[in-house]
């Protein structure tokens, strides 16, 4: 796969990087990595014999054959600079994943939202059908004990990252497109460029491959007529190949009948709530059908699925019967889906939201404000930059002002950091509330701080 046996990952604690490092270690490479932080992923890598360095230094890469980086690594990173000066081959994360997708029949999940959950569901369906897939997922999946697994079977299941166009490097045998939405506009500029990228990815699917599309997404419907000479199936709530009907939604999950072209296949029960998760499961059922897998084993896999870390994840109960949840959602569509789902609990909804990136806040502050209006109380933290440089005039106040203007009755507060957020939460919580920490940054620490002060061992209806 790679020239040389010694591979070093700069920024190894990241979800995508740690998964690739794990796969490389499992394949027998001598792997090392560095990061400014350690987490559960680096602990797991250490158990596999991976050398983990805290912080960055040229000394870490003196004897390596290849250096792997992601888009999050700045060009002035000292290890990156040293690797260039010594002509050590530097590989982008997406190039390494692309190499892996050449080795097996690869099922690539792309789209603005739902990639991690959809990839996880598909992975578990393949696992339950004993195909022993290789799995690379963008979150912690309890069922495989992490975010990656090297299998001996013919399939690989992985997420494709469209944020910087690198999904175009991958080699899908089957491509799943969960949706196309206005995101990463700093890279794409407009929705038409995003649609064009997905059409180009679809073109990469081989003659004997397949495309699986969410027909409920308008932007996908816009491009479907432009797909040429590809075998494709659709899923959605109506007018699609795979559909769901007779739906029962509650806070502990859902039940529904699944149909293929109006022929009932069976009834499905999910332990993860929300209409969006029904859609995610339909894509997994679609993959099962395409690959000719056993339907009963597929349903059993979906019924066992407890979710992915930081996706509507139940964290615990604190005093006065307050439920604490955490979610990764940071785009308006994701925020809306999460809040609609948690509304099923019929509790007052207190949301601590941390905007993610200055560019996303600049482009989508109005839409974020609209999505947050489903809350009863909003506590707005400052923007989590994710390495971006500040944009003059762009801050959380943009969202705050939009909410004040359009939803003056909504209780909303601006805070600066984790400590202020936790303090404000304690002052506004009432008996029986539901507290949600929301965002792709470190907002989850607010919930953890409160739980550390008084977590109760109480059973609730939805436990993941």
Swiss-Prot record:
One family name in Pfam for this protein: Mur_ligase
EC number: 6.3.2.8
Chief subcellular location: cytoplasm
BP GO terms, sorted: cell division; cell wall organization; peptidoglycan biosynthetic process; regulation of cell shape
Family matches, as InterPro entries: Mur-like_cat_sf, Mur_ligase_C, Mur_ligase_C_dom_sf, Mur_ligase_cen, Mur_ligase_N, MurCDEF_pg_biosynth, UDP-N-AcMur_Ala_ligase_MurC
Keyword presence, Cell cycle: yes
Biological role stated in the UniProt entry: Cell wall formation.
Descriptive protein name: UDP-N-acetylmuramate--L-alanine ligase
Protein encoded by which gene: murC
């Amino acid at each position: 796969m790679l020239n040389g046996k010694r591979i070093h990952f700069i920024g190894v604690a990241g979800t995508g990087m740690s998964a690739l490092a794990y796969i490389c270690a499992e394949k027998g490479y001598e792997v090392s990595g560095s990061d400014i932080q350690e987490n559960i992923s680096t602990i797991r890598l250490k158990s596999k014999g991976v050398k983990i360095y805290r912080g960055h230094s040229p000394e870490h890469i003196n004897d390596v054959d290849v250096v792997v980086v992601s888009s999050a690594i700045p060009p002035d990173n000292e290890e990156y600079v040293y690797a260039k000066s010594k002509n050590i081959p530097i590989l982008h994360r997406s190039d390494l994943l692309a190499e892996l997708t050449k080795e097996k029949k690869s099922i690539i999940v792309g789209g603005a939202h739902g990639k991690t959950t959809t990839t996880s569901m598909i992975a578990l369906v393949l696992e339950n059908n004993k195909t022993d897939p290789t799995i690379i997922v963008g979150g912690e999946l309890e069922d495989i004990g992490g975010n990656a697994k090297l299998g001996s079977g013919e399939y690989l299941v992985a997420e494709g990252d469209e944020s910087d166009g690198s999904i175009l490097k991958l080699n899908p045998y089957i491509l799943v497109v969960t949706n196309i939405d206005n995101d990463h506009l700093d890279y794409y500029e407009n929705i038409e460029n995003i649609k064009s990228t997905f059409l180009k990815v679809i073109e990469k699917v081989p003659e004997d491959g397949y495309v699986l599309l969410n027909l409920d997404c308008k932007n996908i419907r816009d491009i479907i007529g432009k797909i040429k000479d590809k075998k494709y199936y659709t899923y959605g709530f109506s007018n699609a190949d795979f559909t769901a009907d007779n739906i029962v939604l509650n806070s502990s999950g859902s039940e529904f009948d699944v149909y293929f072209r109006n022929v009932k296949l069976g009834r499905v029960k999910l332990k993860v709530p929300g209409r969006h998760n029904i859609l995610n499961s339909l894509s997994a059922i679609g993959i099962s059908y395409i690959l000719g897998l056993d339907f009963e084993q597929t349903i059993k896999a979906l019924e066992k699925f407890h979710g992915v870390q930081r996706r509507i994840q139940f964290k615990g109960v604190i005093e006065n019967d307050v439920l604490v949840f955490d979610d990764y959602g940071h785009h308006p569509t994701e925020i809306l889906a999460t809040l609609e789902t948690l509304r099923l609990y019929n509790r007052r909804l207190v949301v601590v939201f941390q905007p993610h990136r200055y560019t996303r806040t600049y482009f989508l502050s109005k839409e974020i404000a609209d999505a947050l209006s489903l809350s009863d109380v909003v506590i707005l933290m400052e923007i989590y930059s994710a390495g971006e440089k500040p944009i003059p005039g762009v801050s959380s106040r943009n969202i705050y002002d939009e909410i004040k203007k359009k939803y003056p009755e909504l209780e909303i507060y601006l805070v600066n950091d984790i400590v202020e957020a936790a303090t404000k939460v304690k002052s506004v919580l009432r008996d029986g509330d539901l507290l949600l920490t929301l965002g792709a940054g470190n907002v989850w620490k607010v919930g953890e701080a409160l739980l550390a002060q008084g977590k109760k061992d109480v059973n609730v209806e939805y436990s993941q």
